[in-house]
From Swiss-Prot:
Enzyme class: translocase
SUPFAM superfamilies, A to Z: ABC transporter transmembrane region, P-loop containing nucleoside triphosphate hydrolases
Residue spans of biased composition, Acidic residues class: 697-709
Species this protein is from: Aspergillus oryzae (strain ATCC 42149 / RIB 40)
Protein name per the record: Iron-sulfur clusters transporter atm1, mitochondrial
């Protein structure tokens, strides 16, 4: 333990706990003040990099959308800041028939662009070839009944009398029949092969556009998202694209073509009666299918909504697996999931039973028409006006219509389902991006070294609870700046506003004299590096998560960044080293290890403006001090503007300036010594934390060790 005289100057201020007094028994209650002080427990970092580790889950930050305010300007700013309330895109809201029809046509027109894209002659050639093959297949199919008729009529002779065989009598017709059927099948399969790339390319483009749009949406959308339902809706929508494109090209128009050909043949060969029955059958069949399918749509929507809810519950429970276990709530989560499954079960039963009704009605209409036409043909055979071959041909032609008709029925059903699925997908693309660039936005120019200025800034996530209230302060370029205050006073919100996750409702934010709303988002965010409270990690390797700070970084640069973040040696001890996977959201490593990986990212990105939001809260004292030493050396060597948000005041007492927030307003500013001499809120927070160390002998020991380490950590330029 170092003598008190050897401690850093910020820990040796006379009159402010220079004498701590005797240790207070452990049972003595902790001090509590009106400023809602958060006490942090110093603990040893554990996790994947420590064999005796347990993961440390963190609670995600939640937000709520900002409702419109009374004044017009405030309304506009509020909407830009946090978005106006919208209906849940994943809840299949019932709409009127006219609105649904408009939405369906809009989707059809949008998808037509992928079928016949401008300046893409390759796609146009494939679509044209596929259509040609389709027409060829339909023509061959229509010829099959003619060959069948010829075969039957040729065979309707006395073979013994003419001394012939099946081959000599009908051989050529049999061969033509087989070749025609083979040709029709071959054309259909070639059509599918040629069109496959068109459908897959469209799926890829739509899915990429939706994903790109989701990444452009503001933070408010993603804080209120339902991950499981969202991914399920995207999956269903992309699958629906292929079916919709195939239906548009290969089912709807071709079926109409085939029906027209059959009606024309029946009229020409056998008279208007046969064609009239065929046409009436088509009208009745189509009308019944469309009407019944429209009635069934609501059951499909209910099933989709229940499916989304079930996926959301399942993903949410599995992601928060540890929380479920901590509170023994497995039965509760199973009950939640089962409730969603029950809703899906009920809706699916309605879908299935209504489908049975639809199929029965379709078969009844078709079978009635077939029986009527066979009766007319049989009368013709009996009267001698038709041959047995004609009877067979009529039967074949009508049965040949059954295939496209059945397709038409199922296609319409699935087409409606695909349109419903794609409606959600395309609605995601219609979500407004609230945080946008001005048309004349220019790249951020840091010609003053990165001075940050907040001028009369007012902002709140909810109109009834503003976070920042007319806040004004300046963060000088190249200095270490700290922001402290009770929880909920707006410390982390400052970063969100600077990063333009939200826009201010009043006032403005300047970086080197440039309003952040006047510069490009890419240049602004490229200049800012962040170590957040809850470090986001991908379910990938350690190397990938570090390299995410700069995607084009080499392996050597990744290692150097890890070394400066004091995590390289721990990584090297792992069997797979930098290839070790960190698990979903980094759950396989501890909070301290997450923070060091986040700092590695920041070092690799090397931005001009650095934000540390409780960046070392999960580290043990030794690691924290060694890491702060490296961070301070970087700040000193490169003169970076840095902002530290902290509850543990010992980690920021060497800052050039400290800003104290209270209830969204700037309460105090100054150096550590100046604020203690002011004897205001900061002094009260400091004294309360010092008393907490005095009351806990273990914390006292850690504090002494921290102070001793701090003697080496703080650069001379920071000691005041």
């Amino acid at each position: 333990m170092l003598p008190r005289a050897a401690r850093p100057p910020c820990l040796r201020v006379p009159g402010h706990f220079a004498h701590r007094g005797p240790a207070v028994p452990r049972s003595t209650p902790r001090i509590s003040t009106r400023h809602s002080i958060q006490f942090r427990v110093f603990s040893t970092s554990k996790g994947l990099l420590n064999k005796n580790a347990t993961s440390e889950p963190k609670t995600p930050i939640s937000g709520s959308p900002l409702a419109p305010q009374s004044a017009d300007q405030k309304t506009k700013n509020a909407q830009n800041a946090a978005g106006t309330p919208k209906r849940d895109l994943l809840s299949e809201t019932m709409v009127g028939k006219q609105e649904q029809r408009k939405a369906d046509w809009a989707i059809m027109k949008e998808m037509a662009k992928y079928l016949w894209p401008k300046d893409d002659w390759g796609t146009k050639l494939r679509v044209g070839t596929a259509l040609s093959l389709l027409v060829g297949a339909k023509i061959l199919n229509v010829n099959v009944p003619f060959y069948f008729k010829s075969i039957v009529d040729s065979m309707n002779v006395d073979f013994a009398a003419i001394g012939g065989t099946a081959y000599t009598v009908a051989g050529s017709m049999i061969i033509a029949y087989g070749v025609t059927r083979i040709g029709a099948t071959l054309f259909q399969e070639l059509r599918n092969a040629v069109f496959a790339s068109v459908a897959q390319k469209a799926i890829r483009r739509v899915a990429r556009n939706v994903f790109e749009h989701l990444l452009r949406l503001d933070l408010n959308f993603h804080l209120s998202r339902q991950t499981g339902g969202l991914t399920r809706a995207i999956d269903r929508g992309t699958k629906g694209i292929s079916f919709l494109l195939t239906s548009m090209v290969f089912h709807v128009v071709p079926t109409a073509l085939e029906i027209s050909l059959v009606c024309g043949i029946l009229t020409y060969q056998y008279g208007a009666q046969f064609a009239a029955i065929t046409a009436a059958t088509m009208v009745a069949y189509s009308a019944f299918t469309i009407t019944t399918t429209a009635w069934r749509t609501k059951f499909r929507k209910q099933a989709n909504a229940a499916d989304n809810r079930g996926a959301t519950v399942a993903v949410d429970s599995l992601i928060n697996y540890e929380a479920v276990k901590y509170f023994n709530n497995e039965k509760f989560e199973v009950a939640r999931y089962d409730k969603a499954l029950k809703a899906y079960e009920d809706a699916s039963i309605k879908v299935t039973t209504s489908l049975a009704f639809l199929n029965s009605g379709q078969n009844m209409i078709f079978s009635s028409a077939l029986a009527g036409m066979m009766y007319l043909a049989a009368n013709g055979v009996a009267s001698g006006s038709l041959t047995v071959g004609d009877l067979v041909m009529v039967n074949q032609l009508v049965f040949q219509l059954s295939v496209p008709l059945n397709f038409l029925g199922s296609v319409y059903r699935e087409l409606r389902q695909s349109l419903l699925d794609m409606e959600t997908l395309f609605n995601l693309q219609k979500v407004n991006v609230n945080i946008t660039e001005k048309p004349n936005a220019k790249p951020l120019q840091l010609h003053r070294g990165g001075e940050i200025k907040f001028e009369n800034v007012t902002f709140g996530y909810h109109p009834d609870r503003p976070i920042l209230k007319n806040a004004s302060f300046t963060i000088p370029a190249g200095q270490k700046f700290a922001i402290v205050g009770p929880s909920g006073c707006g410390k982390s919100t400052i970063l969100r506003l600077l990063f333009r996750y939200y826009d201010v409702q009043e006032g403005r934010i300047l970086v080197d004299g440039q309003d952040v709303r006047d510069v490009t988002l890419e240049s602004l965010r490229k200049a800012i590096g962040v170590v957040p409270q809850d470090t986001p990690l991908f379910n990938d390797s350690i190397a990938h998560n570090i390299r995410y700070g700069r995607i084009d970084a080499t392996d050597e640069e990744v290692r150097k960044a890890a070394q400066r973040a004091h995590i390289h040696e721990l990584i090297e001890k792992l069997p797979e080293g930098y290839k070790t996977a960190v698990g979903e959201r980094g759950m396989m490593i501890s909070g301290g290890e997450k923070q060091r990986l986040a700092i590695s990212r920041l070092i690799l990105k090397d931005p001009e403006l650095l934000f540390f939001d409780e960046a070392t809260s999960a580290l043990d004292t030794y690691t924290e001090q060694a890491l702060l030493q490296n961070i301070n050396s970087v700040l000193k060597d490169k003169a970076r503007t840095s902002v530290f948000v902290a509850h543990r005041l010992r980690t920021i007492c060497d800052s050039d300036q400290i800003l104290v927030l209270k209830e969204g307003r700037v309460a105090e500013t100054g150096s550590h010594r100046e604020l203690l001499e002011l004897d205001g809120i900061y002094a009260e927070l400091w004294n309360a934390q010092e008393m907490s160390f005095a009351q806990d002998p273990e914390s006292e020991g850690n504090a002494e060790l921290e102070e001793g380490a701090g003697q080496e950590v703080l650069p001379d330029s920071r000691q005041k």
